[in-house]
Amino acid sequence: MTGAELKELRLAKGMSQGQVAELLGYFSNGKPNRSMIARFENGHAKINIRIANLIRIVLK
């Protein structure tokens, strides 16, 4: 899965980066870490197969 595909799925569901971060379990200091989702979408962090599968399940 590419960052562009993640962004397309997220926007199709009408979700914010923070909402996706919360569903995927990305937290920092008890708050959803939307910056990790932004890093995925911008290509600054690779989406591994485990996370890609989780994204597909959560955003289905």
List PLM regions with ranges:
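A short, Lys/Arg-rich alpha-helix, primarily the initiator
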Residues: 1-13
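Short alpha-helical DNA-recognition segment
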Residues: 14-38
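DNA major-groove recognition helix of helix-turn-helix/homeodomain DNA-binding modules
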Residues: 42-60
